[in-house]
């Protein structure tokens, strides 16, 4: 019981030091989802007024049907996989949170301070790692729900978009954890900020480089590879 209470107390104290990350994450995801949804719907609303006066340009589609179709498309652009900015944002957040969460290891004073605490290193690592994930998880989830509410308030049935929205959310969280874990490993293996960034670049590029090397070697040394690709 004491160990559990200490763990959550450490999480709370660490989160206080990450308030800047919490605020920044909430703000950036607010612009990426709820704000994007509201601005997109406002733009469609102006088009809708024009369609009521001048027609939609489609004989078989009325203004209301076209408005609904465009809002549905907007849902995918904001909450789905089509939102490229959201993917970039998640990746950038993973790198920043992974880097800043464990930079204390590069400071002798901070390391001495944490070593003086009656806390196991494994527990301290778990606190830092989990807090970094929760910052992104909470910011994404809160703003996703806000954007979802905006769409539902504009005539979109929630059941029709929940599956797509949750699929994108789960995929982004898995991607975040992978990028985040690699950055944390880079920080643990190196000794300063600049080398950590370089190390992360090497780790991020390792798998693509191996994949590219294998494909090139196949083209050079395996004749059937080129033939199979041509036949396909």
Which residues make up each language-model segment?
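Hydrophobic alpha-helical transmembrane segments of multi-pass membrane transport/permease proteins
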Residues: 17-58, 85-96, 200-210
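Secretory targeting signals
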Residues: 73-76, 80, 130-191, 195-196, ...
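Aromatic- and glycine-rich beta-strand/loop motifs that create alpha-glucan
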Residues: 1-24
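Helix-loop junctions at the membrane interface of multi-pass solute transporters
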Residues: 14, 104, 112-116, 184-189
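Long, hydrophobic alpha-helical segments
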Residues: 80-110
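Hydrophobic, small-residue-rich membrane helices and short re-entrant helix-turn-helix hairpins
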Residues: 6-11, 119-127, 190-199
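Helix-loop-helix units of permease transmembrane domains in multi-pass membrane transporters
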Residues: 104-134
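Long, glycine/tryptophan/cysteine-rich extracytoplasmic
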Residues: 47-82, 224-232
């Amino acid at each position: 019981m004491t160990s559990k209470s200490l763990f959550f107390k450490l999480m709370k104290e660490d989160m206080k030091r990450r308030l800047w990350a919490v605020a920044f994450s909430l703000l950036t995801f607010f612009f990426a989802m709820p704000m994007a949804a509201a601005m997109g719907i406002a733009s469609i609303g102006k088009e809708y007024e024009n369609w009521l006066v001048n027609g939609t340009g489609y004989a078989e589609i009325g203004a209301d049907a076209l408005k609904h179709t465009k809002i549905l498309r907007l849902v995918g652009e904001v909450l789905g996989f089509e939102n490229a900015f959201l993917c970039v944002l998640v990746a950038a957040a993973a790198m920043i949170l992974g880097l800043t969460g464990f930079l204390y290891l590069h400071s002798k004073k901070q390391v001495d301070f944490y070593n003086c605490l009656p806390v196991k290193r494994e527990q301290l690592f778990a606190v830092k790692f989990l807090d970094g994930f929760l910052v992104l998880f909470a910011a994404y989830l809160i703003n996703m729900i806000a954007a979802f509410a905006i769409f539902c308030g504009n005539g979109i049935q929630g059941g029709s978009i929940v599956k797509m929205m949750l699929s994108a959310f789960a995929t982004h969280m898995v991607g975040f954890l992978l990028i985040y874990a690699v950055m944390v490993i880079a920080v643990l293996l190196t000794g300063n900020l600049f080398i950590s960034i370089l190390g992360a670049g090497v780790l991020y590029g390792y798998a693509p480089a191996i994949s590219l090397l294998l494909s090139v070697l196949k083209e050079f040394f395996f004749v059937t590879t080129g033939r199979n690709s041509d036949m396909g």
